[in-house]
């Protein structure tokens, strides 16, 4: 009896997870032009606005934390993608909801070549304001165009194939 209950609970949790992803829009859902003037610090403590690190065509913005295993797994792929596409007007921006201290310690272990901004709790507020991640889960990635129209979103670990698909199928 106890085993049956556990199985039913696990099935329920599985389908709840699926339903959250099904409810998330995946194409140009809203304009987030307000984000352009959000001011955050980079890893060197310089205050930048999001528009300072946005791409001429697209910006891939990845919300992450050092304690999030899938986030850490994505980092090398995001840096590689950035290096391969930055000349095409595509920017990759990691927006950490961690402290600057934790991010600096993390960067001593893993080399990251794309833009990194340290947002702390402000990062969670930005995610909430974007409004496309009801659970505020990580990793959370959005792609927006030069007009700050959201083109794609992904809740969970992202693959390089998904990024390529996003860029190749997005409105130009």
What positions do the PLM features span?
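Structural microenvironment flanking redox-active thiols in thiol-disulfide oxidoreductases
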Residues: 73-111, 122-128
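N-terminal targeting signals for export/organelle localization
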Residues: 1-41, 172
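Short, small/polar residue-rich loop motifs at catalytic or cofactor-binding pockets
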Residues: 34, 57, 136-138
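A short beta-strand-turn-helix
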Residues: 37-59, 127
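Thiol/disulfide oxidoreductase modules built on the thioredoxin-like
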Residues: 109-112, 119-168
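C-type cytochrome heme c attachment motif
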Residues: 66-73, 140
């Amino acid at each position: 009896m106890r085993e049956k209950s556990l199985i039913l609970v696990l099935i329920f949790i599985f389908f709840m997870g699926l339903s959250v992803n099904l409810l998330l829009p995946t194409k140009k859902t809203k304009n987030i032009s307000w984000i352009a003037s959000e001011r955050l610090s980079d890893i060197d403590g310089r205050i930048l606005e999001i528009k300072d690190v946005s791409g001429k065509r697209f910006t891939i913005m990845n919300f992450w934390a050092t304690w999030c295993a899938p986030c850490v797994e994505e980092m090398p792929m995001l840096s590689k993608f950035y290096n391969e596409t930055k000349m095409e007007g595509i920017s990759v921006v990691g927006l950490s909801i961690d402290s600057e201290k934790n991010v600096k310690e993390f960067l001593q272990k893993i080399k990251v070549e794309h833009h990194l901004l340290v947002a702390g709790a402000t990062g969670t507020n930005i995610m909430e304001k974007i409004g496309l991640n009801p659970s505020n889960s990580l990793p959370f990635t959005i792609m927006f165009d030069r007009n700050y129209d959201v083109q794609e979103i992904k809740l969970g670990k992202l693959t390089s194939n998904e990024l390529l698909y996003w860029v190749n199928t997005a409105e130009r």
